[in-house]
Regions:
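Upstream accessory/linker segments immediately N-terminal to the RecA-like ATPase cores of bacterial MutS
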Residues: 97-286
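Conserved SF1/SF2 helicase motif Ia
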Residues: 331-356, 368
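Post-DEXD/H (motif II) to motif III coupling segment of the RecA-like Helicase ATP-binding lobe
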Residues: 353, 426-431, 438-451, 459-504, ...
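Conserved helix-turn-beta segment of the N-terminal RecA-like "Helicase ATP-binding" lobe
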Residues: 352-386
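C-terminal helicase module of SF1/SF2 nucleic-acid helicases/translocases
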Residues: 512-528, 554, 558-749
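Conserved motor-coupling elements within RecA-like helicase/translocase cores
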Residues: 378-407, 424-426, 585-601
Length: 749
């Protein structure tokens, strides 16, 4: 159906183009609906909607993803095989025939200029015969191919355009730098160009929102020429300048939004938590290990923030196993000592229980009360191993009365169910700690921050906003930290505890798999345990319809398949368990508990193991389909082993023969810290690797611009200049509207 939609669209436009151009001399506004543009019918309005385009402005901001350079116009006798060019000639003949042995139709045309003739062939595009009428002057653009036997040159599926009369000056698809757009079924780049070209000539360009001094200082092109040249550039250089302007604009708006949030946060009230230095010294002295210098520095930065009268907003970043949790826990104990409460939210029940157990074990004499609240239950721990299992309502009442100072939990801390069960309300919540903050939405975090000072009929200006500390093991490249989290302060733990041994990491070839299995068997015989990570849960359902090569490229072994293989064929005498996100919480808890107690030898799992799981006796990380993961994620997987006294190993398996993939995996084996891998990931895979699977709402252009450190720094500098001068943006009303609108759509998670 694709060519049917396209053909009807093109035929309609071809026959009505002059009318469309004449009609559109009446000025269109940027916010005019597409339905107001004559020549675009309901069917194509719907196609544009599928691309998120509803207005003229949204269409003009639907930027090309790349360009085809057909600007080299040559004689037919001058063309060379494989080299992109445009030829102009007269159609001498056109025919349609069914291809031999193939279920398709061929349209063939012969075009002639004063230097020679050339044949053009289109496959399954029979509508083209209506355009390629004998005697018409046309442009053909593409890279010519040579016939196998005769060596004669011809065009295969070239771009074409009728250029008789005045049309030659308005070429859109040939003889120029041609834009290629994001498309949808039934709406091609050719169709999009047909619509954009006349609109560009008739639209009223809005007022420039970037201040003149910023435009001048950063050498930015104006809005009107930028719109024209990003769609129909005279050169690739023109296109790059226009793209730079729009990329800068998106980053500039983002930074204004984030810096505005930062300025607003400073005006909020928070509980001042005076840190008892003697208590802190006593707590750290009682730890079974010494804090690293990085941990001490991070703890000092956090303590300093908490002692202020406005809310802390800090990200604590460090490699897996670097000791972030103990730093956050010490901050929570210090808050409790001042009579305040701390909420500690984790993304999974497994991790929440782990944090709860760590707090109990590390601070056994803490008598302020440590509660665990998850979807499957609740309990409270007081000093000297006095632990009470209670129903959630009882635990909630204790928290609301202030009888529990540290509350660890999952989404259950903020849950509001159909039964009427609400999340927890705290009496004096002063500190919120969120582990792996990018796994929670902005609204979820806001709900937790709102669990504090809610009573007494206080206005928002009178309320006390909790200090906010987020933790992440995801290494964040400097470019992203500048661009996406300029509203946060950063603390980085750059050292690993001295008792951590280096992990021997190897990229394993398929022929070495039996030896790797034997190695695992030997390690388990010595009392150790192993993780096996697979990217997918379910196997493909239509394997029989795929070739071996397609299976080889597309199917990563599922957890269930791997579990069956390992438990029945490879390690039949060992205890193998399986863990994935579709299991019930109670089942996952039992599996992890058994693995932690060494009742299970091998745990086959999905990427859930990436987040926080701590089993010191596990010494082998076995990653299937390693090429399917980002470098930083592989580094985090590796950090799940090497936490005990025994030497640990990480095996990276890939069935791919690609040298590039092998090179990427070897970089993980050689890496000494996650940050250098994160920088590589940003260049190779883009910012989506760090922002997670959930859409941020950020424009594609801004996402791509995040790979340009220099442009990010320029935009941040410009935003700071404007915010410092006019914090409320009152002098720039249109810019202020744009920033507010941007904030409604974009969320950094």
């Amino acid at each position: 159906m694709l060519f049917t939609f396209t053909s009807s669209f093109i035929k309609f436009i071809n026959s009505n183009l002059a009318f469309v151009l004449e009609y559109n001399k009446q000025m269109l506004e940027f916010d005019s609906p597409l339905s107001s543009v004559r020549g675009i019918g309901p069917r194509f309005i719907q196609k544009f909607k599928q691309l998120g385009i509803n207005t003229v402005g949204e269409l003009l901001c639907h930027f090309p993803v790349r360009y085809e350079d057909f600007s080299d116009v040559v004689k037919i006798s001058e063309i060379s095989p494989g080299e992109k060019c445009t030829v102009r000639g007269i159609v001498k003949k056109t025919s349609v025939r069914r291809a031999w042995r193939k279920r398709m139709f061929l349209v063939e045309s012969e075009i002639e200029d004063d230097s020679g003739k050339i044949r053009a062939v289109w496959f399954n595009q029979t509508y083209i015969q209506n355009s390629m009428g004998v005697g018409k002057v046309v442009n053909l653009s593409g890279a010519p191919s040579a016939e196998r036997k005769s060596g004669q040159l011809y065009f295969s599926n070239p771009s074409y355009e009728i250029v008789s009369g005045n049309a030659a000056a308005r070429a859109k698809h040939t003889a120029r730098i041609v834009p290629i757009y994001p498309e949808t079924k039934g709406l091609t780049s050719r169709g999009i160009r047909y619509v954009i070209k006349p609109i560009l000539e008739s639209v009223k360009i809005p007022e420039e929102i970037i201040p003149e001094k910023i435009m001048s200082k950063h050498g930015l092109m104006g809005l009107a020429p930028s719109l024209r040249l990003i769609h129909f550039p005279n050169s690739i250089s023109d296109a790059e300048k226009a793209r730079r302007r729009f990329s800068f604009e998106e980053l500039f708006i983002l930074e204004l939004r984030l810096l505005g949030e930062r300025a607003k946060n400073v005006k909020n009230n928070a509980y001042k938590i005076d840190i008892d230095i003697n208590l802190l010294k006593s707590l750290t002295a009682g730890l079974p290990f010494k804090l690293t210098m990085s941990q001490k520095k991070a703890l000092w930065e956090i303590s300093k923030d908490m002692s202020r009268s406005y809310p802390m907003n800090r990200l604590l970043q460090g490699d897996v196993g670097s000791g972030k949790t103990i730093v956050a826990a010490l901050a929570g104990i210090c808050a409790a000592n001042g009579g305040f409460q701390t909420a500690f939210m984790a993304p999974t029940e497994i991790l929440a229980r782990q944090h709860y157990e760590t707090l109990k074990k590390t601070f056994p004499n803490f008598d302020g009360g440590i509660a665990l609240v998850t979807g499957s239950g609740a309990k409270i721990y007081y000093a000297r191993e006095l632990e009470t299992h209670a129903d959630k309502n009882t635990v909630k009442r204790e928290i609301e009365k202030g009888g529990v100072k540290i509350v660890v939990g999952t989404h259950a801390l903020i849950a509001k169910k159909r039964t009427g069960e609400n999340g927890i309300t705290f009496k004096k919540l002063a500190l919120v700690i969120v582990d792996e903050q990018h796994r929670f939405g902005v609204k979820q975090r806001a709900l937790l921050l709102g669990r504090g000072d809610t009573g007494g009929g206080k206005t928002s200006a009178e309320r006390q906003i909790p200090h906010f500390l987020s933790m992440s093991a995801t290494p964040i490249p400097r470019t992203l930290s500048l661009a996406l989290w300029s509203n946060l302060d950063f603390s980085s733990i750059t050292e690993m505890p001295k008792n951590r041994k280096p992990i021997d990491t190897r990229v394993v070839e398929p022929r070495e798999r039996p030896a790797a299995y034997a190695f695992i068997r030997n390690e388990i015989a010595r009392g150790r345990q192993a993780f096996v990570v697979c990217p997918r849960i379910e196997p493909a359902t239509n394997d029989e319809q795929l070739t071996t090569k397609e299976l080889y490229e597309l199917i990563v072994k599922s957890v269930k398949e791997e579990y069956e293989k390992l438990s029945k064929k490879i390690f039949p005498g060992l205890f193998v368990a399986m863990l994935h996100g579709r299991m019930k919480a109670e089942e996952k808890e039992k599996i992890m508990r058994d693995f932690s107690l060494n009742k299970t030898n091998i745990l086959v799992t999905t990427s859930v193991i990436e987040v926080g799981v701590d089993v010191p006796n596990a010494t082998i990380m076995f990653i299937e389909g390693a090429e399917r993961f980002g470098l930083a994620q592989l580094y985090q997987f590796r950090g799940r082993v090497g936490r005990g006294e025994h030497k640990s190993y990480c095996f990276l398996f890939s069935d791919s023969a690609s040298k590039d993939i092998e090179k990427r995996l070897l970089s993980v084996a050689k890496a000494k810290n996650g940050l250098e891998l994160a920088e590589s990931d940003l260049k190779i895979r883009g910012p989506g690797e760090f922002l997670g699977d959930e859409q941020t709402g950020m424009p594609d252009l801004a996402m791509k611009a995040l790979k340009n450190p220099a442009l990010v720094e320029e935009a941040l500098e410009a935003a700071k200049e404007i915010i410092n001068e006019y914090e409320s943006l009152s002098n720039y009303p249109e810019l202020k509207k744009r920033v507010e609108k941007f904030g409604e759509k974009v969320h950094m998670e």
